[in-house]
UniProtKB/Swiss-Prot annotation:
Residues 52-75, 99-117 form a propeptide. Pfam families: Motilin_assoc, Motilin_ghrelin. A lipid is attached at residue 26 (O-octanoyl serine). Residues 28-69 are annotated as: Disordered. Mainly expressed in the gastrointestinal tract with higher levels in the stomach, medium levels in the duodenum, jejunum, ileum and colon. Low expression in the testis and brain. Not detected in the salivary gland, pancreas, liver and lung. Keywords: Amidation, Hormone, Lipoprotein, Secreted, Signal. Residues 31-43 have a biased composition (Basic and acidic residues). A lipid is attached at residue 26 (O-hexanoyl serine). This is Appetite-regulating hormone.
Amino acid sequence: MLSSGTICSLLLLSMLWMDMAMAGSSFLSPEHQKAQQRKESKKPPAKLQPRALEGWLHPEDRGQAEETEEELEIRFNAPFDVGIKLSGAQYQQHGRALGKFLQDILWEEVKEAPADK
């Protein structure tokens, strides 16, 4: 008779062979493909919420305050595009750190440019 190791090996190989056969059957069998689509459609799509800024949790509330407050938009192109929108209060709070960050990035670019030529 066959040893238990041989039997386990044959079982493992047959299971792997079945998995390979099932993977290839979706192309040939439209029913298997439909079953896979049904399984995927059961999961509801995830809703993405914007991050809360300064305690604003709902976008509906944000629209009212934005009408009264002016926004500042900063855009510049370097080797990459950067765009930032800030309200007046956010600019007052983070303006100095943002300025230092941009200055560091831009001065790095200027210092590296002559070395490349």
